[in-house]
Each structure stands twice: as C-alpha cells, then as structure tokens.
Amino acid sequence: MQVLTNTKFETVAFQWPAGFYSDGIHIGLRRHKKDFGWLFSKVPASAAGTYTTNQFQAAPTKLTKQMIDQGHQLQGLLLNSAIANSCTGEQGWQNALQEQAWLANKLNVAPNLIGVASTGLIGAQLPMDKIKNGLPQLTPTKSDAVTYAVLTTDQHPKTVCVQCELSGQLVTLTGFAKGSGMIHPKMATMLGFVTTDAQIDGPVLQDMLSTNVDQTFNQITVDGDTSTNDMVVTLANGLADNPSLQAGTTDYDIFNQALHYVLGQLAKQIAADGEGATKLVECNVVHAATTFDGQQIAKAIVGSNLVKAAIFGEDPNWGRIISTIGATDADIDVATVDIEMNGVLLVQQSLAVDFDMAAVQATLRDNQIMIDVDLHHGTASGQAWGCDLTYNYVKINASYHT
C-alpha cells in the first residue's frame, strides 16, 4: 500500500477508484470534439445527488434523481454534451428512458441502476440514432476521456483526485465537472461527478454530499443564471473494503474532509473557467451574525457585475463592494465593516483608509483575486468564488446561437 503523509488526505495524479471505468468519444453531437461518454462501476454503488432548483428541470436530471431517490444506488451513467434534452416534452422524457434502457442492456444490469446526464442547448431533441450507434463504441477504460465528453463552452476539464486511509484501507476519490456559463447554482451546479471506492451507505452519503455542496458548489457564480440541468452525483462502490462509514467516527471525518476538498476544488476550477474569465475571485467573510449571512454576502460580492467589471479593470473600487454588502438583507452593523483586497486594507469601520493605489492595482493584475470582509458582528463566516466580467463573456454568449 502507498504510504500517505500525515495529512488527512493527499492529492494524487488522476486515476479512477477501484472498479470504476469510463470512456468518452465523438458521435457527431458536436462538430469535432468528444460529446458522448459513460461512467460505470463493476458493482452497484451507493449513490447520492443534488439537483437544480430551476422549475424547468431537464428530463435526464429528473430521471437520475428518481433512480437515486428510489434505491440510493447506481451502477452506470450515460453522459452527453451539446444537447441538454431540456424543455423537450414527453419525447424528451422517453428519449431519456431509452438511453437508460440501452445502457442497462449494455451493462446487463437493471434499468433502475442507470442514470443519465446531458448538457448543452435547451429545447433540442437528442438524435437518438447517433446515441444508439455510439453506444457500441464505448469501451471500459481507465482514461480521462469522459471528462472531455461533457464540456460545452469550457476551456478545459475540471478534475481532482485525492487519497486517504480509512481503517488501514487506501481509499480514492476522483471528481470531474463541467461548467463555464449559466452558473449560479441552488442545490447543485452544472454537472459534477465524484467516484470513490469507499464503503458508505447511500443515505449517509446523501447527507454528507448535500452539506458539502451547500458550502462549495452552491457558493460559486459566474453569471447569475441557474441551469435546467445542474446536477452533482457521487458514487461509492465499497471496493476499498473499509468498514462502512458512520457519522461520529474518525474515518467519517477524514472522508468528509476529503469529499469537501474535492468538491471545493472542482467549484473553484469552474469559477476560474467562467466564460471569458481572466481572474478567479475569492471572497471570505468573517465575524458574520450567521453562516447564512456570511455566505449570502460573499456570494453577492463575487456575483456583482459592478464588482466583477471593476476587477477586470484592475480597479480596487471598494464602494461597489460595500454597496453590495448593504444591498443584502444580512444582519450587519453599518459602522463596523472592514474590507481588504489582496491583503491591502481599503476600508476600516466602514470608512476609507489611505492606501497605495498603484501597489493595489499591481496586485490586481494577478489571475487570483482575494476579497476579505470583516463584519465585526458575530462569529460565523462565509466563502464564495466567482470570476471577472470581460468583453469576451458578451462575445461568447452573443455568438452562442440556437
């Protein structure tokens, strides 16, 4: 067994956990790039998911949620980009069911162990002939090709892999995600997948995933729009042979920290790859009255178009930040707010302080920007991630036609 460091977990090169296989290919949904893939475990896996709150929830999202809610297990997922299969009516629903049946037949498992995930253009029907013809081309590999098959306007895949020891057994967690635009999640974000060979019951995994998604994926924003297809799914097949994880144990805490890290890293990678983005923006709020207040303020700041535009312009415009704070319904003291940008104090007790404008502007040329807010009004905190707003965001979305 690999000897781990003294940390609870460590990052490692991309690899699938024991028993997981995948593939990603091109079947003509996109012009040239990979657009179709699968991910499966050789044994049924405990499954958990979080899903978009958009009322026009897409057929694949509804279907996968139904399967996980019914049995807390999945064994395979069929994935595609380019076409979202959203707002497609009864035909879209039947197409999702057909995809499920085809993959179940290919894997020789019950249909209720199969989920479906789609992303892309809303309103178009899937070309089922291409899906059917593409299925035989999918092979069980250990490559990362599937991480490319779900991309749309993304510049690159988002992946992370960590390992930890649970009761002496080496456990791997591997996650990948897609997302660049239409990112302002509520309960989930774009498409995200985490696989692990840890042993954990589905309901326990669901509680853990939901809590961690709220603190990570739900705290990023690129453009304030919540997709119809947002979904985060976690699969745990138990092949690491650790004792089943239970709340209140050391193993549970270690795994929970590892899962939080994986989700957090994927969330930050998505924010950094926002459409047209040149800078990742992180906001930390401390001494808030409640965690909700801290999270609300942090997300409002990174989501403010005025703040995002100022960061693109490399302008430490703290007035836009404090105005955004005041526009929330958070419980604050308007006389006690401190604001720092990249470690430089701009505002103390809600009043301007002298600072070296040129020095601050120089730090804003970096591709990672940190905004720190101290409310001096409690003991809670919040964190959120976003990106700058650039000319290219408008260009990309103006040229994305139906």
From Swiss-Prot:
Question: Which domain of life does this protein belong to?
Answer: Bacteria
- Residues folding into a coiled coil are none
Record's GO cellular component terms: cytoplasm
One Gene Ontology term from the biological process aspect of the record: L-arginine biosynthetic process
Main EC class the enzyme belongs to = transferase
Question: Could you tell me what reaction this enzyme catalyses?
Answer: N(2)-acetyl-L-ornithine + L-glutamate = N-acetyl-L-glutamate + L-ornithine; L-glutamate + acetyl-CoA = N-acetyl-L-glutamate + CoA + H(+)
- Record carries keyword Acyltransferase: yes
Kindly give the SUPFAM superfamilies that the UniProt entry links to this protein.
DmpA/ArgJ-like
Entry GO MF terms: glutamate N-acetyltransferase activity; L-glutamate N-acetyltransferase activity
The entry's active site is T189 (nucleophile)
One Pfam short name: ArgJ
UniProt keyword terms in alphabetical order: Acyltransferase, Amino-acid biosynthesis, Arginine biosynthesis, Autocatalytic cleavage, Cytoplasm, Multifunctional enzyme, Transferase
Question: Any idea of its EC number?
Answer: 2.3.1.35, 2.3.1.1
* Compartment list: Cytoplasm
Q: Where is this site: Involved in the stabilization of negative charge on the oxyanion by the formation of the oxyanion hole?
A: T119, G120
The answer to whether the entry has keyword Amino-acid biosynthesis is yes
What does the entry list as the binding residues for substrate? T152, K178, T189, E275, N397, T402
In this chain, the site described as Cleavage is at A188, T189
Give the pathway listed in the UniProt entry for this protein. Amino-acid biosynthesis; L-arginine biosynthesis; L-ornithine and N-acetyl-L-glutamate from L-glutamate and N(2)-acetyl-L-ornithine (cyclic): step 1/1; Amino-acid biosynthesis; L-arginine biosynthesis; N(2)-acetyl-L-ornithine from L-glutamate: step 1/4
Q: Could you give the subunit structure recorded for this chain?
A: Heterotetramer of two alpha and two beta chains.
Q: Which family does it belong to?
A: Belongs to the ArgJ family.
Q: What does this protein do?
A: Catalyzes two activities which are involved in the cyclic version of arginine biosynthesis: the synthesis of N-acetylglutamate from glutamate and acetyl-CoA as the acetyl donor, and of ornithine by transacetylation between N(2)-acetylornithine and glutamate.
Q: Which HAMAP family match?
A: ArgJ (MF_01106)
**Protein name in the entry:** Arginine biosynthesis bifunctional protein ArgJ
Q: Mind giving the lineage of the organism this protein is from? A: Bacteria, Bacillati, Bacillota, Bacilli, Lactobacillales
